[in-house]
Amino acid sequence: MTVSPNTAEQAYLDLCKRIIDEGEHRPDRTGTGTKSLFAPPQLRFDLSNDTFPLLTTKKVFSKGIIHELLWFVAGSTDAKILSEKGVKIWEGNGSREFLDKLGLTHRREGDLGPVYGFQWRHFGAEYKDCDSDYTGQGFDQLQDVIKKLKTNPYDRRIIMSAWNPPDFAKMALPPCHVFCQFYVNFPTSSPDPNNPKQAKTAKPKLSCLLYQRSCDMGLGVPFNIASYALLTKMIAHVVDMDCGEFIHTLGDAHVYLDHIDALKEQFERIPKQFPKLVIKEERKNEIKSIDDFKFEDFEIVGYEPYPPIKMKMSV
């Protein structure tokens, strides 16, 4: 038996297998049915040296991950903006039929309501529609995270949450990836505030811990892992840090019944080394704010996955 050097991806595959073998059979909102475990062991991914945890045992839609994250960061909630870029992952939840089923008959197609991006950038603002300008409204959690990392990196409140119960009735889908916390490790000795001239041997390392309440292991989780790894990378660049780890805490970790055969095919594959994701050299000095990033700024190097495996999204 060949043992993969990529223990992080193997841990993900082993968890999927355990859910299929031991999980409880449960009905679900979509009507598809799942096998589910609650609060399995965390998944951990090393992000140092530009490592990017994009699964290798199937080709993952990296274009979709980058575009969706930039869409969150922009505070956008309009699925049509993503669709126009060839990223159709939100079309089901933004369709006329789906919105009408939720009673959101007044909402135009593609308007998802106050979902992730709105909560990240305008928490507490009153949501009208996806075409309104919310500049200066609500609380900008993402900028608050960045400010704390720059001014008080030891803070234990460096947190961003998409969980806002009063807004649920307006959302096409309440958040699955709910809440993340950032933590800074300082190399060797901690910086001495009384000695500003102290030599810095290396940059501090930024790590991210995500709590995800609902974890679609086959289709969604590979996306979420890469997305939060990329978010950590972007924030680290803006605050002049290196990346440490991404730690993924899962609540209801489930495999949809119609994904089991596809995952069994994936289990036969031996994980390869993760690729690297770099910010293009010519743009590094130009990107000073989290809002400066563009799709073209990122380059994924050394990604040699196995072929794609089709899995249907349950809406």
UniProtKB/Swiss-Prot annotation:
Pathway(s) where this gene product acts: Pyrimidine metabolism; dTTP biosynthesis
Keyword Thylakoid annotated: no
Enzyme Commission (EC) number: 2.1.1.45
GO CC terms in record: cytosol; fungal biofilm matrix; mitochondrion
Binding site for dUMP: R29, R156, R157, R213, S214, C215, D216, N224, H254, V255, Y256
Keyword flag Methyltransferase: yes
UniProt-listed NCBIfam families: PRK01827.1-3 (NF002497), thym_sym (TIGR03284)
Subunit note: Homodimer.
Name assigned to this protein: Thymidylate synthase
Organism: Candida albicans (strain SC5314 / ATCC MYA-2876) (Yeast)
Taxonomic lineage of the native organism: Eukaryota, Fungi, Dikarya, Ascomycota, Saccharomycotina
Name of the gene encoding the protein in the UniProt record: TMP1
